């Protein structure tokens, strides 16, 4: 009967795999291939792999833009046609916000100064 792995003697344990074995690498030797015979035909042409495979979804827009002729690309200003509307709206909201804050601070300061003046007049009279 085979002893359980926990009870086996450490001397009989298998050695851990080497780095090459663990990574699935085999030792390779670098050597130049022999020159082809003079009557040998060249290998058949294979297109590059990037043209054979389909592009990933995130590059689809770039690919579509590349397929269009340069004269048909939208101008840079076309991407910002609605930008001036948002800029104007933001400017109006910012100005209204500044006016609102100025009115609120003015009312609060005037209310505090009115309470102080009425309080001093009431105590002296």
Curated annotation (Swiss-Prot):
Q: Which organism is it from?
A: Human cytomegalovirus (strain Merlin)
Disulfide bond residue pairs: none
- GO CC aspect terms: host cell cytoplasm; host cell membrane; membrane
The annotated topology with respect to the bilayer is: Single-pass membrane protein
Which InterPro entries does this one have? Answer: UL42 (IPR035110)
Keyword terms, alphabetized: Host cytoplasm, Host membrane, Host-virus interaction, Inhibition of host innate immune response by virus, Membrane, Transmembrane, Transmembrane helix, Viral immunoevasion
The entry describes its oligomerization and partners as: Interacts with host ITCH; this interaction induces the ubiquitination and subsequent degradation of ITCH. Interacts with host STING1. Interacts with CGAS.
Q: What is known of its domains?
A: Late-budding domains (L domains) are short sequence motifs essential for viral particle budding. They recruit proteins of the host ESCRT machinery (Endosomal Sorting Complex Required for Transport) or ESCRT-associated proteins. Contains one L domain: a PPXY motif which is involved in the interaction with ITCH, a member of the NEDD4 family.
- According to UniProt, the name of this protein is Protein UL42
UniProt feature, compositional bias: Pro residues: 32-47
Chief site of localization? host cell
The compartments listed are: Host membrane; Host cytoplasm
Single Gene Ontology BP term?
Answer: symbiont-mediated suppression of host innate immune response
Q: Which family does it belong to?
A: Belongs to the Cytomegalovirus UL42 protein family.
User: What residue spans carry the region label Disordered?
Assistant: 1-47
What domain of life is recorded for the organism?
A: Viruses
Q: What does this protein do?
A: Plays a role in the inhibition of host innate immune response to promote latent infection. Mechanistically, suppresses viral DNA-triggered signaling by impairing DNA binding and oligomerization of CGAS. Also impairs the translocation of host STING1 from the endoplasmic reticulum to perinuclear punctate structures which is an essential step for its activation. Regulates the function of host NEDD4 family ubiquitin E3 ligases through its PPxY motif and thereby prevents the excessive ubiquitination of gB and its degradation by inhibiting these E3 ligases.
Motif PPXY motif location, chain numbering = 16-19, 42-45
Transmembrane stretches in the record are 89-109
